[in-house]
């Protein structure tokens, strides 16, 4: 039986999800078909009896949005990554992949993703200094006293969007999404393969980290392989134009009924997406309004914790491998960063480093 606390927790995560969906739309992903991913996620939670929901993650959108040169490549990256992760989860290989890479290398990779997020935020601010700067100032002003990411994203997006409308006197003149059911056939090229592998590597780390955190909040066992299966299957909705959804740190984990609260959150977002309201709302929310939030989660919420996990009490080879993984990820992408870190972890002891 759902309680008021369950409903409030779900609503809080919904408020966090709406700006992320608008952010995804700025890269060409479509709102209505993204509802399919949320429904698949809810069905997966119900089928496996887990407490770990999925939603749009800023890091995922920033990675896919920047690695894909156009919407065809972005959708293809999400689809192929979804296939990879669904297979890995179904075979129960997620922990084996983590063990092979090494937890410090994976943590270094995730810290590198934090730097990528900060770089995307800075590029957004450069593209629109007025909106981006207001978003950044608001995000910092809210995050420092509260350390609450939901308040941070809502405040920074609302304030910077209001400033944009005050300055321009009218919403953006963009075409409102008119979705018709259609299949976007995935393409295959070097960029797509690299992007799919990069997203898969990022998903391995986030599923283990975020899945364990949310399950820990609920006092439940974290079935990461199950999470990997249904988050991977949810991303197959990108074949219809949907944005990819991934594991998140969800406040629903702290609700009295975390499973039901998580399912309610995803179904609510699916209904909002199908209603067609978000594409209309997106005319009033410039892409750069999310810049402050991206900077905060990159610099303050992602880099410090993962860098600490990567380097704290590390042996010399582990230290070098984590540093390589972090640096190369920040300069290229998570897949190349992970591979570079693994190579250093293997050869460093042989070379006596």
Spans of features found by a protein language model:
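Alpha-helical transmembrane segments of multi-pass membrane transport proteins
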Residues: 12, 202-203, 317
């Amino acid at each position: 039986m759902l309680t008021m606390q369950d409903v409030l927790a779900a609503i809080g995560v919904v408020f966090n999800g709406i700006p992320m969906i608008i952010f995804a739309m700025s890269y060409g992903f479509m709102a209505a078909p993204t509802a399919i991913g949320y429904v698949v996620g809810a069905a997966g939670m119900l089928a496996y009896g887990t407490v770990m929901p999925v939603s749009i993650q800023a890091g995922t959108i920033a990675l896919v949005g920047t690695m894909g040169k156009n919407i065809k490549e972005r959708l293809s990256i999400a689809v192929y990554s979804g296939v990879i992760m669904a297979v890995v989860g179904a075979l129960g290989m997620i922990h084996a992949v983590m063990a092979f890479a090494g937890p410090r290398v994976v943590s270094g990779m995730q810290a590198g993703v934090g730097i990528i997020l900060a770089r995307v935020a800075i590029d957004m601010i450069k593209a629109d200094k007025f909106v981006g700067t207001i978003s950044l100032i608001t995000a910092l002003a809210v995050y420092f006293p509260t350390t609450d990411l939901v308040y941070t994203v809502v405040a920074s997006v609302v304030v910077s969007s209001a400033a944009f409308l005050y300055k321009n006197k009218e919403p953006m003149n963009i075409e409102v999404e008119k979705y018709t059911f259609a299949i976007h056939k995935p393409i295959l090229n070097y960029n797509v393969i690299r992007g799919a592998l990069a997203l898969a590597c990022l998903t391995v780390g986030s599923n283990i980290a975020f899945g364990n955190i949310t399950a820990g909040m609920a006092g439940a066992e974290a079935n990461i392989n199950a999470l990997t299966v249904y988050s991977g299957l949810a991303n197959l909705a990108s074949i219809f134009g949907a944005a990819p959804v991934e594991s998140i740190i969800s406040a629903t984990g702290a609700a009295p009924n975390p499973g039901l609260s998580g399912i309610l959150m995803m179904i609510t977002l699916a209904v909002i997406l199908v209603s067609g309201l978000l594409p209309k709302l997106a005319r009033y929310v410039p892409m750069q309004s999310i810049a402050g939030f991206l900077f905060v989660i990159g610099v303050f919420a992602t880099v410090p914790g993962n860098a600490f996990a990567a380097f704290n009490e590390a042996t010399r080879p582990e230290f070098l491998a984590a540093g390589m993984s972090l640096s190369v990820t920040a300069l290229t992408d998570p897949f190349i960063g992970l591979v570079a870190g693994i190579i250093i972890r293997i050869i460093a002891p042989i070379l006596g480093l």
